[in-house]
């Protein structure tokens, strides 16, 4: 059900980290309520990229995305960025009005750079604010490093898996790092 308080979580897998030369391989979204309960998972979309573009990937990306099957999905996909953005927006419209949810995820400013470049209509669907779990990760690592042992990640580098891990990580920080009080 549509709500102003729902949060949009997104993750992209890319050919690299430079939006000037690299491209989006996969996009996934999910919706949580304000209490971080996952209430809907959006489409997981592999985006076709040319062989020339795939050959520009560094060895790390080739190794990871070959092992997780993403390169093969990208080769078989018929979707381009515009179509993937439209399908994602169609899902988001069922859950959150445009301009209301911050963009949520891990190192989300990196994903936003790619959205701005290749899926500007989707990027504009988000509020200008962001909810970046990596901020809490960096603070916890410095201020309360012992809690970091409680965070378990598979590092599958599949977009939907990564988003689920981001939500779980924020739930963990809420319980073990943030001091929440009902008296305030």
UniProtKB/Swiss-Prot annotation:
Catalytic residues identified in the record: 128
EC id: 3.1.15.-
Name of the protein in question: Oligoribonuclease
Enzyme class (EC, first level): hydrolase
Cell compartment(s), UniProt: Cytoplasm
Gene Ontology molecular function: 3'-5'-RNA exonuclease activity; nucleic acid binding
Family named by the database record: Belongs to the oligoribonuclease family.
Key words of the record: Cytoplasm, Exonuclease, Hydrolase, Nuclease
Function field: 3'-to-5' exoribonuclease specific for small oligoribonucleotides.
A GO biological process held by the record: DNA metabolic process
InterPro entries listed in its UniProt record: Exonuclease_RNaseT/DNA_pol3, Oligoribonuclease, RNaseH-like_sf, RNaseH_sf
Coiled coil: none
Ranges of residues in domain Exonuclease: 7-170
Species for this entry: Baumannia cicadellinicola subsp. Homalodisca coagulata
Gene Ontology CC terms: cytoplasm
């Amino acid at each position: 059900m549509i709500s102003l308080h729902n949060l949009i979580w997104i993750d992209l897998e890319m050919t690299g980290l430079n939006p000037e030369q690299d491209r989006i391989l996969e996009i996934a979204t999910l919706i949580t309520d304000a209490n971080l309960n996952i209430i809907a998972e959006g489409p997981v979309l592999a985006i076709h990229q040319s062989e020339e573009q795939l050959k520009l990937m560094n060895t790390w990306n080739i190794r990871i995305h070959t092992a997780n099957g993403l390169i093969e999905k990208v080769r078989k996909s018929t979707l381009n960025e515009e179509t993937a953005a439209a399908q994602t927006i169609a899902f988001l419209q069922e859950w959150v009005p445009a301009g209301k949810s911050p963009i949520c995820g891990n190192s989300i400013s990196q994903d936003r750079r790619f959205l701005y470049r290749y899926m500007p209509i989707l990027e504009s669907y988000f509020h200008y604010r962001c909810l970046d779990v990596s901020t809490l990760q960096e603070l916890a690592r410095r201020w309360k490093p012992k809690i970091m042992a409680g965070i378990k990640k598979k590092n599958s580098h599949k977009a939907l898996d990564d988003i689920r891990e981001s939500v779980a990580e924020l739930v963990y920080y809420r319980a073990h790092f943030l001091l929440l009080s009902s008296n305030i």
